[in-house]
């Protein structure tokens, strides 16, 4: 590794944190110094930013701070994105105060250029924060391999810099001993401030269109930006949390003043929400300097402060140095040999309960405490450190193997936890499987000699009522249910998501059973699904089961046709054709676009009346015997699809979907007329099966949308369905729209209130 200090004359406190990612030793061009911030989203005590400022000053070059919010990071979702948006606001403000150019790129539809590849061609140097996990380290390596300038990584996360030690020690006490002198030298050091002239402005072209920060400070515009991102919208933001540097600093000052004195006594009580700093999200994203926290906690000088420092300096940094030293930190091969042997010995032990992925995610295990732990992660993005260890040691009992347990534990942590996708997360999940530990005899079923933490034992020492109240809290107090109009795929999925987050939900549907176009009709003469959605075989076969599963535990009122909706300041009133009314906190409508205008009393765009749809006439034929294959294989220019009523070889029902062109031509004809016309189209088949069959025609006036309408803003009404998301006219599109609609509904209601000014997040493993 090249000596960065000798090349660029950086001061020791920065040089020791550097590793050069390529072999280019000279700054030779007049392009900007690019400070690429990925995981250190602050301006105070930021080694990467300080190094960039010094280099720009030394070489008299422009300086540009670049932040990208990518769609490709593991478990990219609305929760993580929203925190990154918060961080961008403060980072922009901080750079402005320092007189530094800052540019934000949010990858999204129509905005996915290879920005860093372009900077690699034009920059004088690239300085980036060192984050030792895939895919971030691969991204840096790739840029370094093509860059025509020096690429420098700088540790901004640890008091003992990763390049200075950077070894994996098998036990925390050995790490403590090995780093004692390194730690002692740095713990109390003040961070040097820079007294520099404002750097030159970069007035050259940028390889992307920067996002105006005002688009993030407006919650309506922020949501619109989020909607363009290809991420998981079902993982909602934590509404009472705020990211960013300012909130992190306020939270730290409050804990330093009021919380650190009682930390040693209170830290293990998960029912005591204020017993820990709850700064791990801010630390993970580098919104606050760990060097600052350690220095100021060290100055307190109490036993409680020492214990707090122990967690940061030993257990946290031990994990970071371990991950830094490993090429593939997620793999089970990183466990000690004794643990691997133990897992091999218990590989065939009986697991009495095996959980599916959804059971894990939604906290549907056989254990009450574990379910509360997972609900805390799912809804609030946090899990108390002391419980997190017990939670993580339960997954081996409900999965088939060591690999499956590691994968599931990491998945649950990284998808939902605001501090997930972190070296501490990996070390924590792996510790639950034996990392950094010793054998415990005698061996037990499944766990072998790996340390066990019984859920029942932990529950016995926890105030379960207090912890349950803490976990089941909601940021928004409902007075009325959220009402979903339509019980098809879109309605069922949006209802499921809202219910999973603890909201009261009611679904209204005009049909006799839930399912909308996708429902399977159970008639005396046969079983069939005649929906015109673009369904795959499995989707057609399992549509009812999928929709009913989504609606499990949710109130559904069928045979209810909503005819009008009236908005009030804090609620919405829905009325059906019989004059019955419902009061709702907010509403999601899944109707076809042209049906919305009469329901909403002409408050939607006039062009929605004529929104373009494919139309289909469908013929349902019910025979006495199963449908012959010769009929299924028949093709005609007027017929879009011929299939069985359900994907069953013994089905006695035939479904014939006519093309849009044919259907539009005969759209206003009577059903009897259409039956006769379609039977004329089928005459060439000449099958006796039709002689004893019954016939019924159904008109799908709004079968599949051709375009997506422009979204409109309404504080308490939002829209879902296969017209509102790509791919249009498909089940996938309907589900995608539902996930965003559920997010949009809660987003608008929560952000109508004042956002908190402080980040509230629990400790790491």
Residue ranges, per PLM feature:
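Conserved flavin/dinucleotide-binding core of flavoenzymes
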Residues: 431-444, 448, 454-475, 493, ...
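A conserved short coil-to-beta-strand element within the FAD-binding core of flavoproteins
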Residues: 558-572
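Glycine-rich FAD pyrophosphate-binding loop
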Residues: 483-485, 489, 499-522
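Central helical "cap/lid" subdomain
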Residues: 515, 580, 584-630, 688-690
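Beta-rich, aromatic/charged-enriched effector core domains that present basic-aromatic interfaces
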Residues: 101-233, 429-432
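Glycine-rich active-site loop/strand segments that organize a redox cofactor
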Residues: 510-544, 552, 661
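Active-site-proximal binding-pocket segments
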Residues: 269-463
């Amino acid at each position: 590794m090249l000596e960065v200090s000798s090349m660029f004359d950086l001061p020791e406190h920065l040089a020791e944190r550097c590793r050069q990612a390529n072999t280019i030793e000279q700054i030779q061009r007049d392009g900007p110094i690019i400070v690429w911030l990925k995981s250190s989203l602050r301006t105070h005590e930021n080694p990467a930013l300080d190094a960039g400022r010094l280099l720009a000053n030394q070489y008299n070059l422009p300086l540009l701070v670049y932040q990208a919010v990518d769609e490709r990071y593991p478990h990219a979702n609305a929760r993580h994105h929203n925190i990154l948006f918060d961080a961008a606001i403060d980072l922009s403000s901080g750079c402005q105060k320092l007189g530094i150019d800052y540019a934000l790129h949010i990858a999204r539809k129509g905005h996915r250029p290879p920005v860093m590849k372009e900077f690699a061609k034009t920059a004088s140097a690239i300085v980036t924060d060192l984050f030792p996990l895939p895919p971030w380290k691969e991204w840096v390596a790739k840029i370094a391999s093509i860059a025509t300038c020096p690429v420098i990584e700088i540790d901004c996360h640890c008091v003992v810099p990763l390049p200075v030690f950077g070894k994996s020690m098998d036990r925390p006490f050995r790490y403590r001993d090995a780093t004692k002198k390194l730690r002692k030298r740095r713990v109390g050091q003040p961070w040097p401030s820079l007294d520099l002239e404002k750097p030159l402005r970069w007035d050259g072209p940028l390889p992307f269109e920067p996002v105006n920060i005002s688009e993030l400070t407006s919650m309506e515009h922020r949501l619109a930006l989020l909607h363009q991102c290809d991420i998981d919208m079902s993982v909602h933001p934590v509404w009472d949390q705020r990211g960013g540097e300012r909130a992190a600093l306020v939270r730290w000052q409050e804990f330093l003043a009021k919380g650190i004195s009682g930390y040693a006594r209170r830290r293990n009580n998960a029912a005591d929400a204020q017993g820990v700093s709850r700064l791990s999200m801010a630390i993970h994203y580098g919104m606050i300097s760990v060097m600052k926290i350690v220095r100021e906690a060290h100055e307190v000088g109490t036993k409680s402060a020492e214990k707090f420092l122990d967690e940061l300096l030993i257990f946290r940094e031990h994990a970071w140095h371990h991950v830094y030293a490993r090429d593939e930190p997620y793999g089970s091969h990183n466990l000690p040999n004794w643990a691997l042997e133990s897992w091999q010995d218990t590989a065939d032990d009986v697991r009495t309960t095996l959980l599916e992925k959804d059971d894990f995610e939604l906290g549907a295990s056989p254990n009450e405490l574990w379910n509360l732990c997972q609900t805390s992660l799912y809804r609030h993005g946090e899990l108390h450190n002391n419980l997190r260890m017990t939670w993580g040691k339960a997954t081996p009992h409900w999965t088939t193997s060591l690999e499956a347990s590691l994968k599931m534990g990491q998945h649950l942590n990284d998808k939902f936890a605001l501090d997930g996708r972190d070296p501490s997360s990996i070390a924590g999940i792996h510790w639950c499987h034996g990392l950094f530990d010793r054998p415990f005899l005698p061996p037990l079923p499944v766990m072998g000699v790996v340390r066990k933490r019984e859920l029942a034992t932990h529950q016995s020492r926890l105030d379960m009522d207090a912890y349950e109240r803490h976990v089941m809290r909601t940021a928004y107090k409902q007075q009325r249910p959220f009402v979903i109009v339509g019980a098809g795929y879109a309605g069922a999925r949006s209802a499921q998501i809202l219910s999973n987050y603890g909201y009261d939900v009611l679904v209204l549907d005009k049909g006799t059973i839930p399912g909308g176009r996708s429902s399977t009709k159970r008639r005396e003469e046969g079983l069939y699904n005649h929906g015109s959605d673009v369904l795959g075989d499995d989707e057609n076969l399992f549509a009812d089961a999928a929709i009913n599963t989504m609606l499990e535990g949710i109130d559904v009122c069928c045979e209810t046709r909503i005819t009008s909706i009236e908005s009030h300041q804090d609620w919405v009133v829905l009325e059906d054709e019989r004059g019955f009314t419902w009061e709702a906190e907010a509403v999601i409508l899944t109707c076809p676009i042209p049906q919305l205008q009469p329901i909403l009393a002409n408050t939607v765009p006039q062009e929605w009346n004529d929104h373009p749809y494919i139309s289909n006439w469908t013929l349902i034929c019910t025979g006495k015997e199963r449908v012959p294959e010769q009929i299924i294989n028949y093709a005609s220019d007027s017929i879009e699809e011929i299939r069985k009523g359900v994907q069953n070889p013994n089905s006695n029902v035939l479904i014939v979907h006519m093309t849009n062109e044919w259907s539009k031509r005969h759209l206003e004809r009577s059903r009897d007329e259409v039956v006769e016309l379609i039977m004329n189209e089928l005459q060439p088949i000449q099958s006796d099966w039709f002689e004893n069959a019954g016939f019924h025609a159904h008109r799908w006036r709004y079968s599949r949308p051709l375009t997506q309408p422009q979204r409109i803003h309404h504080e308490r009404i939002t829209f879902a369905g296969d017209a509102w998301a790509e791919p249009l006219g498909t089940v996938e599109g309907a589900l995608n729209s539902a996930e965003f609609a559920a997010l949009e509904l809660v987003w608008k209601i929560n952000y109508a209130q004042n956002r908190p000014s402080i980040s509230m997040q629990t400790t790491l493993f």
